[in-house]
Amino acid sequence: MQQIDFYMVDAFTSTTFGGNPAAVCPLDQWLPDQLMQKMAKQHNQSETAFFVANDDGFELRWFTTQSEINLCGHATLAAAHVIFEHLKYPHNTINFTTRFVGPLSVSREGEWLTLDFPVWLSEPVQQPPALLTECLGITGYREVRAARDYLVVLENQQQVEAIRPDTFAMLSLDKMVCVTAPGDGEYDFVSRFFCPGEGVAEDPVTGSAHSMLIPYWADRLGKTQLLAYQKSERGGELRCQLNGDRVLIGGQAKTYLVGKVWLD
């Protein structure tokens, strides 16, 4: 019987029960894709990160309960936390290779981990689908853009907080949905992220969406260093920086659970 270490980590938070939880499984070698998919479904977290050490660092993959995905920020942060804290990685930067988005890295400075991700530039959507505003329950917006996800820009933080989406109706959209606005106080911008098609009605903290949010707000606010907050029930703070064609996304993480997966 094969035993695999299992960790559950709350990412983008300094306290347990905050941020976004992810499952993490270090592997000696890759398991069959079908088996990793079954494991991710059994873990019942929004994402499970699997990684295997290689000569340059680690190969990293992410699975939702339904499928493998191309990028996941909070599960990358969670995997890096496990490598630094539990596997006692001796260096301050972890280099990951991925199947879909090329090389990624995570650096450590004190309690903060910083993701180095590619920029995702969004384009204006001149005629957004009516279903988009209907399922968000809004009648107006500052603008709508699209990249991997729809980006719906509202006027203020209160409007973002007031969203009560129809996530069942949202299943008919062809993209996931990010809602954002300028922050009221200490935060430059706030956001929420809805992805019912991935099995998650509202994602607590979405690192990958900030690959799109950071270049947008850097341009609008005229600054390259930003402080962001995702206004979900659990919530999460992100230190953000635009660095050319890359974004730096900083957060903290806390281990919630350590255990073993037993495979026949």
Predicted feature locations:
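Active-site proximal loop and beta-alpha junction motif in alpha/beta enzyme cores
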Residues: 1-71, 77-264
